[in-house]
A protein has these predicted regions:
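Generic structural signal for well-ordered, non-membrane alpha-helical segments
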Residues: 3, 7-10, 34-42, 151, ...
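N-terminal capping segment at the start of a domain
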Residues: 7-35, 140
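Flexible, glycine/charged-enriched surface loops at secondary-structure junctions
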Residues: 27-28, 56, 170-175, 258-273
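A non-catalytic alpha/beta surface segment that caps or lines the substrate-entry region
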Residues: 29-78, 82-84, 88, 99
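Buried hydrophobic packing segments
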Residues: 45, 157-165, 249-253
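Active-site metal-coordination/substrate-binding segment of hydrolases
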Residues: 75-175, 180
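Midchain, well-structured core segments that form catalytic/ion-binding scaffolds
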Residues: 127-130, 136-149, 183-274
Length: 274
């Protein structure tokens, strides 16, 4: 694969944004944003949008960053297009103190960094997409934290596009709505976005996938919380009386179709994920 030239503005923004901790907190999912730190990046982005000439750039009380870019001359009658990315990062690994660095990848295992003297690496077996990236410069964390490319890569791309439009008025484009939303990782995302004020006929979420891939449908899911209550009895006197809540859960899990799990499904096939 030929080395891809990266837009310096995208790279600079990405390296800067990932160093701002924005982890959402599932334990606080009853409030939006679930973590106050998401305002840190939200305020930075709103200010940068204002500097780039975006209209009505602001941060809502729920940490949504919203702004609009007028259509270029001659494109005023085109449908408004929305571009969306999310501020927060997942809780699956530490998100504060991210130290991004660039690794020139030559193939094989990708070593991001070290933890306790041991290399932190990703293999092509676990991440087949690496096979298409030999010869590329890849941004990695130092191995002690997540990187936050999901979705600060999308944030950086959208911001760089806004900057490019601001610098070159000859670029044709419809009216654009920009939104950076909180708490996507815990199931909220665009939940509290004012669609009418956003004012876009169509919108795309810039979040992951290989270069050139465009998806025109949305993933859809529903969530349920199931509570299992047992009866605690001393094991020596438990016959006919003890109810093990853990076993109830196992029985429940066994009722779900085994092959309808994420590891066995693809495409339009639905799945159950506990």
């Amino acid at each position: 694969m030929e080395n891809t030239t990266t837009n310096p503005d995208v790279l600079e923004r990405f390296l800067r944004y990932v160093q701002i901790n924005t982890q959402s907190e599932d334990a606080n999912c009853d409030q939006v944003p679930s973590s106050a730190v998401q305002f840190d990046l939200a305020n930075v982005l709103a200010e940068e949008l204002r500097e780039l000439g975006a209209e009505d750039a602001h941060v809502t009380e729920h940490a949504y960053v919203c702004a609009h870019i007028p259509a270029s001359a001659g494109a005023e009658d085109k449908p408004a297009l929305g571009l969306i990315a999310h501020l927060d990062t997942t809780e699956v690994a530490p998100g504060a103190g991210v130290k991004p660095h660039i690794v020139h990848y030559e193939g094989g295992g990708l070593v991001c960094g070290t933890v306790d003297g041991k290399p932190v690496a990703m293999s092509t077996a676990k991440l087949p997409a690496l096979n298409d990236l030999a010869g590329e410069d890849l941004v990695c964390s130092d191995g002690t934290t997540l990187l936050g490319a999901d979705d600060k890569a999308g944030v950086a791309e959208i911001m760089s596009l806004v900057a490019r439009i601001a610098q070159d008025s000859s670029l044709p484009h419809p009216a654009l709505g920009i939104c950076f939303c909180p708490d996507e990782e815990i199931g909220h995302g665009a939940e509290l976005l004012d669609i009418d004020t956003f004012g876009c006929k169509y919108a795309y979420t810039v979040d992951g996938g290989p270069i050139g891939e465009l998806e025109w449908e949305c993933f859809n899911a529903a969530e349920a919380t199931v509570r299992f209550e047992g009866q605690s009895i001393h094991p020596g006197d438990a016959k006919g009386r003890m109810v093990n809540a853990g076993n109830l859960f196992c029985d429940f899990n066994a009722l779900l179709p085994y092959v309808q799990r994420p590891e066995y499904t693809e495409g339009y096939e639905g799945f159950y994920h506990l």
